[in-house]
Amino acid sequence: MNVAIVGATGYGGIQAVNLLKKIKKYKISFLGGNKTSGSKWNENFPFIYLDNDPYIEEISVDNISKNADVALLCLPNGLSSTLTRKLLDRGLKVIDLSADYRYKSLDEWKNVYSKEAAIYKRNDDDLCKEAVYGLPEINKEAISKGRLIACPGCYPTSALIPLVPYLSQGIIENEGIVIDSKSGTSGGGREPNQKLLLSECGEGLSAYGLINHRHTSEIEQVASLISGNKIELLFTPHLVPISRGMHSTIYGRLRDPGLTSDDCRILLDNYYRNFKNIKVLPVDTFPSTKWVKNTNQIFLSVKVDIRNGRIIILSAIDNLLKGQTGQAIQNLNLMSGFSMDEGLDLTNNFP
């Protein structure tokens, strides 16, 4: 299976190269990056050494499609949409890591990503409707049959996996859900950003994107589909001075206030017992980003506050792996007919 990595020099693309080079069932057929096109891969990334030391090539439909079966688009929001239809028309399957196809309505995307919509004049509502939301834990069968996969955002991944079992079975109320998340700086990408400078964000913690963060509507869209009811929730992200890692604390109201922490843990464990990358921790053991760093795992924990009938669900992921490229490889595996976790048995180098 030949895979083109488009946008290979960003954090998502770099992770993709590092993962795919170790999976013998795949061959990297193209490395695309306009800023570094014409230079050799090992010259730019000697720490992810490729034996054939390929050139990084200019991003174009012709270059991408000449030898590829699948295109992994690791591009900024909006840019993926300029390539997707042309690649599909040439018979390639597409896995998109941007937000371009996460919404079932192009109008919704334009509303949320208005800045990008002003630059990229899209008319591919049909592809928005066709795209499969690439969260394997809820869409495994659809992903395996799809030709266009929209990989979830990192925050939605860290929030939806803990929420899905309780929403799908009506354990928690649809109103009053609060998500409090923290992300490492790599979530902001590789482009220079003053807010991500060490002297700006080091030794500090700050919230951003209150009320109107783009991932709020993405979480709400999927949560509403899962629950069968319209859900509006409160999501607040924070930036923490670590390079990679994401932690979410989710609060909800139990429909049955008699449920205990053990009850809710058993439900969570049973729901995900067939997913080897999901670890449900014992009651009173709470996940740390240290435990999942450099892995595709998600650690979950749950606690019930019996005083007020609230449930607290916690999750920890590596935002560049389960929150981004590792999840994309899970989707690639499913589309290729392989085990979902092929090549993703990654070791955490604690501490």
Swiss-Prot record:
Q: Where in the cell is it found?
A: Cytoplasm
What EC designation does it have? 1.2.1.38
Q: Name one GO molecular function term.
A: N-acetyl-gamma-glutamyl-phosphate reductase activity
Identify which residues the record assigns to the active site. Answer: 154
Q: Which Gene3D superfamilies does the record match to this protein?
A: Dihydrodipicolinate Reductase, domain 2, NAD(P)-binding Rossmann-like Domain
GO annotations of cellular component type: cytoplasm
Describe the task this protein carries out.
Catalyzes the NADPH-dependent reduction of N-acetyl-5-glutamyl phosphate to yield N-acetyl-L-glutamate 5-semialdehyde.
The family this protein is said to belong to: Belongs to the NAGSA dehydrogenase family. Type 1 subfamily.
Query: Which protein is depicted?
Result: N-acetyl-gamma-glutamyl-phosphate reductase
- Organism, by scientific name, is Prochlorococcus marinus (strain AS9601)
Taxonomy, top ranks, is: Bacteria, Bacillati, Cyanobacteriota, Cyanophyceae, Synechococcales
